[in-house]
């Protein structure tokens, strides 16, 4: 899809660009919570964040949004291989995000598209998450649902729980997505705007927008996918070395850092 917005003032996938996006959206829509939407809602913009690799970058985005008086939802995995939501550091970060007024949810891959199994697995993860974080959870998002589209087509509803892919916030299409669906879904997955850029809303008839943002894709400097992953890997390595240094008193952190930087 072609775009009509001007990105010359901010690097792609930089926090500056995200500020521009939020500013423009705020001028056109009420950016509200999933819980504020019902069948009678005529226009809305909801924004969510699925946390894949970086809890730290999620906090940076949460702070940015809070500065602009925008509240969104952050969905965490409890069995992610790249971060532990229950480490003391990450627990503090998740609490900081919640204290900023954002909602917290569960991000998971159900083992089946059967509603009974989805329900059971969600409530299991909800119990674990709430017991360890002391944060109440009332929502979930599916991880990589494109690999099992049936879980989207079923429009799974659980009383008292928000499924961000329910038909109140999301339209499922078996075939080609129409140019102007009733609910416009926008995602930055794989560092691409395959369904259009949020600023395309400036020249559209969209009245309902659901935006998925992955915080790990965004940074102060921005850049392409390759540059982003290089910077992300460096951040992860730095965090690992800091953690080892905290745990092992005789860890030669200065020598390791010199070797790492010279490589």
Predicted features by range, described:
Residues 1-73, 77-89, 98-100, 111, ...:
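Terminal accessory/targeting
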Residues 103, 107:
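Beta-strand-loop-alpha-helix segment that lines the small-molecule cofactor/substrate pocket
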